[in-house]
Amino acid sequence: MHEIDNKAKEAKEKKAAYGPDIDLKDYCTEGECHEPLENLEQLPEEEKSTMLKAGVDSSEEGRSGSYVQRDTTAIYASSVMDGLEVLPIKEALKLDWVREYYWKLVPVDQDKFTSLAYSDLHNGYVIRALPGAKVTFPVQACLYLHQDALSQNVHNLI
């Protein structure tokens, strides 16, 4: 077992420094699978409306890229600009360069939440602008829960 695995294991009951102590056993970690989308207009109207309240526009107008995760499933990742990558982290982890940034800023043993995100990663995103890229519009991301009492274990890299 690697040192990072041991650190995560040792922190699986460690309380967070801030906020109430939440019992993670009250949440399930197995989410239902959702089909990927070709575009965000395929989302149900109610979900599009809710996302818009959080600033995520399903038309993607004025956006350089988008990432949407429903429960534990990355259902949409897109970039419309050259030199901009928007990827689900599970896909990005297959790329060598991602490992040099993965879990380097936030320690896996910070608390039980980081421990769980490391040991039972559902997904998350990687957003990267390549050297020389001119990204003129924002990238939008939305990670939401459709299933009640689900733990959404994510790690994001920007």
What label would you give each PLM region?
Residues M1-I158:
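Glycine-rich and polybasic anion-binding loops at the starts of cofactor/ligand-binding domains
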